[in-house]
């Protein structure tokens, strides 16, 4: 009787272990974590930081994007390094490498493996990129982060720069003080967020994308509003494993 009981326990534990391993293996390593929501900032004026980036425990292979708390700049994490951009003048900015910042809403993921491909030459604009990503990632878990590397023929990026003490109750008010910057023939990296179900949460109401661009010399960085991508442009998608 004791022998049968021991065998039963052993089999049960073995099945539990296998189930646990299977469940762990089935979880994608690039799962996007979202903190806060764009609509709470834009419509409810919740400008305080909901996440301190320095508290993210695993910074290895980390990627992420969002605004600085109180809409005082932009944040981009790429290859485990965190960058904050802030306004200096209407024509210049400061880009600082730091994790000592907070964001009112933020999206991030640890991505250790990428699938690289060359973006078709016909994909040049944000609208074309959105349609292309939607078409080729039907089997990829969503939302997901992606990366682009290459030269941008033309681009417009912005840095939010809300005056201190401002109250916000609409997107128009949230963008008070925002400054746009134009780029021409700049080598750059773009980290983007794609989802068809996160409008007003992490993307604006008219798009599936939220992207931040940083030049390869790390001197300019901001939220990407317009772009003409120059071929060849490399697209990196997270490997689902």
Segments from the language model and where they lie:
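Mid-length scaffold segments of soluble, non-membrane domains
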Residues: 119-179
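Short, hydrophobic/π-rich interface segment
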Residues: 163-217
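C-terminal motif of bacterial Sec signal peptides marking the signal peptidase cleavage site
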Residues: 17-20
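Bacterial N-terminal signal peptides that target proteins for export
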Residues: 1-8
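Bacterial Sec signal peptide processing site at the extreme N-terminus
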Residues: 22-32
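C-terminal structured interaction module
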Residues: 212-241
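Contiguous hydrophobic, core-forming segments of folded domains
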Residues: 84-144
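N-terminal low-complexity or amphipathic/hydrophobic leaders
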Residues: 46-103
């Amino acid at each position: 009787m004791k022998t049968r009981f021991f065998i039963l326990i052993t089999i049960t534990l073995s099945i539990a272990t296998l189930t646990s391993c299977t469940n762990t293996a089935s979880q994608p390593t690039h799962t996007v974590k979202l903190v806060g929501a764009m609509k709470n900032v834009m419509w409810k004026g919740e400008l305080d930081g909901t996440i301190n980036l320095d508290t993210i425990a695993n910074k290895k292979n980390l990627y992420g994007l969002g605004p600085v708390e109180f809409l005082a700049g932009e944040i981009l994490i790429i290859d485990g390094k965190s960058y904050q951009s802030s306004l200096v003048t209407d024509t210049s900015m400061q880009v600082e490498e730091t994790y000592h910042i907070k964001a009112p809403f933020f999206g991030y993921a640890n991505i250790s493996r990428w699938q690289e491909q060359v973006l078709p030459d016909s994909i040049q604009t944000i609208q074309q990129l959105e349609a292309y990503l939607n078409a080729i990632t039907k089997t990829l878990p969503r939302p997901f982060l992606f990366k682009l590397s290459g030269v941008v023929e033309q681009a417009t990026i912005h840095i939010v720069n809300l005056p201190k003490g401002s109250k916000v109750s609409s997107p128009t008010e949230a963008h008070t003080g925002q400054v746009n910057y134009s780029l021409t023939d700049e080598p750059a990296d773009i980290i983007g967020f794609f989802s068809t179900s996160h409008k007003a949460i992490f993307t604006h109401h008219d798009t599936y994308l939220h992207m931040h661009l940083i030049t390869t010399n790390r001197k300019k960085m901001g939220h990407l509003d317009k772009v003409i991508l120059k071929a060849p442009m490399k697209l990196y998608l997270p490997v689902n494993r």
